[in-house]
Amino acid sequence: MEHRIVGPGPYRATRLWNETVELFRAKMPLRKHRCRFKSYEHCFTAAEAVDWLHELLRCSQNFGPEVTRKQTVQLLKKFLKNHVIEDIKGKWGQEDFEDNRHLYRFPPSSPLKPYPKKPPYQKDVIKFPEWNDPPPGTSQENIPVRPVVMNSEMWYKRHSIAIGEVPACRLVHRRQLTEANVEEIWKSMTLSYLQKILGLDSLEEVLDIKLVNSKFIIHNVYSVSKQGVVILDDKSKELPHWVLSAMKCLANWPNCSDLKQPMYLGFEKDVFKTIADYYGHLKEPLLTFHLFDAFVSVLGLLQKEKVAVEAFQICCLLLPPENRRKLQLLMRMMARICLNKEMPPLCDGFGTRTLMVQTFSRCILCSKDEVDLDELLAARLVTFLMDNYQEILKVPLDLQTSIEERVAHLRRVQIKYPGADMDITLSAPSFCRQISPEEFEYQRSYGSQEPLAALLEEVITDAKLSSKEKKKKLKQFQKSYPEVYQERFPTPESEALLFPEKPKPKPQLLMWALKKPFQPFQRTRSFRM
């Protein structure tokens, strides 16, 4: 009898039901039986069905050896109600199946359960808040996109280092992170981790993301005691004092210092019944209705114990703090009772471990819509929780560290240079559009050369630069972008035209300076012969 492992994913409970029904119909031994002087072919007794199906479920890795015979009978009752089987006279539709010699058979056809139909979803990538995100409330439609081809001035700023200018840097504080931003980061990264562990393309069919409260996650991480138990801000949501005292009594048995009532024979059974009654009358299971599919999906990972523990850790972070606290206290009590050798038997028909699972599985996990396998799935989950509750109900440090580093990074200052992305002003909004392969090849080949050519022309025509500075920049440009430079100056003659040789100036005649300049009306001696 081989039961395929049903992995994590949407509708896992329905997939398990269909898998079990198919295997039961295909493998259940059928033979001839007599009843009231009449023979019936291809049928089986109720007891034979219970024996065979019980062994199948116990050997299945989807359910495990903790499945009881009583649970198997409950499942066969649901088989009878859903017309998976019928009695030998063709009656079905009610859960009157009992573990006896009554005869049953398979109907000609046994329709499998259909999967719930949901509208197709678009695969949305969980988005983390970024530095440049617009403030909350800004429309996300038609957000301008940076132009693909920059103008020469922007390119000049970007590549100023290549032509010899290093601009001064400055520190820029990004937009202040609000409390809502931080909460959204916690929610987004937590769900992203869960999605990655489950190996799903989307959590939409496993979890209603809108019902996930980021405040619960943050509270469950930081508001904890030294023992790791959640501390509630609202004390009205605490366990009643009498329930907490009863749980401490059984957890510390036989040292019950909290209870002042005198002990009597069977006292521990009454205390246990009090605790079971309180948890059994909760309005909602501790793992909540809306997280049922998420926890059932994680059950498909139990073959990889470490991965399953990580997935359960994250799922338990999504719980309301009061539910997480009640679950922590309950699991600690259950584990201590099972390990306590001095504890008297709490039930004559079951062992202590089986009793814990059967008593509390439904108040821990159940479906709002009464899924047919929810009892078996809940028992499987509670068994795993009891064995690993200390790890599962701890805060996952890897996730906490990653989120804290992310928040710190967004709050950190950043070094920016003039002309970097944040300084680009868009002349007109442009939007992404699909281009042809030919246009892509052209942009890849020539898209970057046009701004460089324009930049080179600006250097050439810049009248503010001296010839020496201009030659220096052109030499650096030639070294950085030889193809563009070669296209502009294909020959040495074309380069020489840029710097024509100036004619050498003629040397000026030196005039002798007179020692004594002429004075006005100065009389001169006449020489007569």
Swiss-Prot record:
Q: Which UniProt keywords apply?
A: GTPase activation, Phosphoprotein
- Source species, domain of life: Eukaryota
Q: Where is this site: Arginine finger?
A: 231
InterPro entries found in the cross-reference section: DEP_dom, Rho_GTPase_activation_prot, RhoGAP_dom, WH-like_DNA-bd_sf, WH_DNA-bd_sf
Q: What biological processes does GO assign it?
A: cell migration; intracellular signal transduction; positive regulation of Wnt signaling pathway
Q: Which residues carry this modification: Phosphoserine?
A: 160, 436
Q: Does the keyword Nuclease apply?
A: no
Q: Which Pfam families match?
A: DEP, RhoGAP
Q: Does the keyword Cytoplasm apply?
A: no
Q: Which residues form the signal peptide?
A: none
* All copies of domain Rho-GAP, residue ranges: 201-393
Q: Which cysteines are joined by disulfide bonds?
A: none
- Domain spans labelled DEP: 24-108
Q: What's the name of the protein?
A: DEP domain-containing protein 1B
Protein's organism: Macaca fascicularis
Lineage from the top down?
A: Eukaryota, Metazoa, Chordata, Craniata, Vertebrata
What is this protein's gene name? DEPDC1B
